[in-house]
């Protein structure tokens, strides 16, 4: 289940030295996360289904 404060996400570009997922909150804050972590994949799946 995804926290309600997350609106969307995107992956960093291939130009970045480190792969990451960036979540956007309702207050337009950006939160970087490791795409290999289980909780990150779960949040992505939850956002895709909503």
From Swiss-Prot:
Subcellular location: Secreted
Family named by the database record: Belongs to the intercrine beta (chemokine CC) family.
Protein name, entry field: C-C motif chemokine 5
Gene from which this protein is expressed: CCL5
Primary subcellular site in the record, as a coarse category: secreted
Role summary: Chemoattractant for blood monocytes, memory T-helper cells and eosinophils. Causes the release of histamine from basophils and activates eosinophils. May activate several chemokine receptors including CCR1, CCR3, CCR4 and CCR5. May also be an agonist of the G protein-coupled receptor GPR75. Together with GPR75, may play a role in neuron survival through activation of a downstream signaling pathway involving the PI3, Akt and MAP kinases. By activating GPR75 may also play a role in insulin secretion by islet cells.
GO MF, one annotated term: chemokine activity
Stored Pfam families: IL8 (PF00048)
SUPFAM superfamilies according to UniProt: Interleukin 8-like chemokines (SSF54117)
Gene Ontology biological process terms from the UniProt entry: antimicrobial humoral immune response mediated by antimicrobial peptide; chemokine-mediated signaling pathway; eosinophil chemotaxis; G protein-coupled receptor signaling pathway; inflammatory response; positive regulation of cell migration; regulation of insulin secretion
InterPro entries linked to this entry: Chemokine_b/g/d (IPR039809), Chemokine_IL8-like_dom (IPR001811), Interleukin_8-like_sf (IPR036048)
Keywords: Chemotaxis, Cytokine, Inflammatory response, Secreted
CDD domains, per the entry: Chemokine_CC
PANTHER family referenced in this protein's UniProt entry, alphabetically: C-C MOTIF CHEMOKINE 5, SMALL INDUCIBLE CYTOKINE A
Protein species of origin: Sus scrofa
Example of a GO cellular component annotation carried by this entry: extracellular space
